[in-house]
Structures are given as C-alpha cells and as structure tokens.
Regions:
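Active-site rim helix/loop that mediates acceptor-substrate recognition in acyltransferases
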Residues: 44-63
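Acyl-donor (CoA/ACP) binding surface of acyl/acetyltransferases
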Residues: 1-38, 53, 66-181
C-alpha cells in the first residue's frame, strides 16, 4: 500500500482506504437487491466480508482498489468508488457502488472524478473504463458526466460472463483536455 495511505477529499466527500469498520455499511449495500441489481445480485454477509478483505488486500498488494466514500457532513459511509483491475477484466476501471440513500445527489460523479484524477496522476493509467449494463441508465449518466463515451459491448470474466455489459471509456489525454477547459 502506498505510504501514507491515500485519502482524497472533495467538496462533500472523503475517499479513503477501506477498513474493517466499514463492514456493516458494506454488508447493508451488498444485501440491498436494488443496489446489487447490476452487480450479480444480493450477496450474503460472508461473501461481502470476503470482498471487503479482498479490497483491503488489493490496496496492500496492488497499491489501489476502490475507496470507501464518506460524507464529510455526517461521517457516514455511503459506498465505494475507485480503481479496479481484476484478473481477466477488460481494462483499468473506475467503478462505483453507492448505498441507495446516496443516489441522485451527485456523489457518484463527485467521487469518481476524484478517483479518476488519482488513477491518471498517481497510477499512471492511460485509459479508464466503466463496465455498465445496457439498461443501467443511472450509471450511464455518471459515465457521461465524467466525459466517458460508449465504446461498445464488453466481455467480462466468469462469473460475470453471462451478463452483457457495455464498455464506456476515455483516455488520459481526453480527461485532462476536458479538465483544462
């Protein structure tokens, strides 16, 4: 893990490395059928626990993984947003999963903007993608706000290979050109 661990700050949010204390909120998100609709469905607590540990481990092994997203005003965990690249994944992704209570407030785009800046500047990525279900209109809107465009259908690794996705993407050059405007 980078030392010190990264912490990003936006106008309303703090993005930090996940920790054990995030588990109950993380499990609530994993148990919410509406939130998990495009992410493989509801997950039992044991699976959520393994995923949290894998995310924390990824920070130590790879130096990146999704951040925990905390509202500054309440100190409340509202989701996870950030860089990921699983084995067999179609590219270097900035992904987002927010608790339903946090939907519709611009938090996903705000956090993903900070995470994208970080991935391009600190990780040196040349491109980011977002793997989005064709009928996930809300995530498509977030991708558009970030400046990403739909590149076409994508192929996910097992166990997600049965779920069709569209790849949205943009290059580092496109990102920084838009940010400079």
């Amino acid at each position: 893990m980078p030392s010190p661990p990264p912490m990003l700050e936006t106008a309303r949010l703090i993005l930090r490395v996940p920790c054990r204390d995030d588990f109950e909120a993380w499990a609530a998100v994993g148990g919410d059928a509406e939130v998990m609709r495009y992410l493989g469905g509801v997950q039992p607590r044991f699976t959520v626990w393994k995923n949290l540990l894998a995310t924390i481990g990824s920070w130590h092994v790879l130096g990146f993984a999704p951040f925990s997203v905390i509202r500054k005003d309440e100190g409340q965990w509202i989701g996870r947003v950030g860089p990921l690249r699983h084995a067999g994944w179609p590219g270097t992704e900035i992904g987002w999963t927010l608790a339903r209570a946090a939907w519709g407030r611009g938090y996903a785009a705000e956090a993903a903007t900070a995470a994208t800046d970080w991935a391009f500047t600190k990780l040196g990525w040349d491109e980011i993608i977002h793997c989005i279900a064709a009928d996930n209109i809300a995530s498509q809107q977030v991708a558009r706000k970030l400046g990403s465009v739909k590149r076409g259908p994508g192929k996910m690794p097992a166990p997600y290979d049965e779920e069709p996705v569209e790849i949205w993407a943009q290059s580092r050059e496109e990102w920084f050109a838009r940010r400079a405007q």
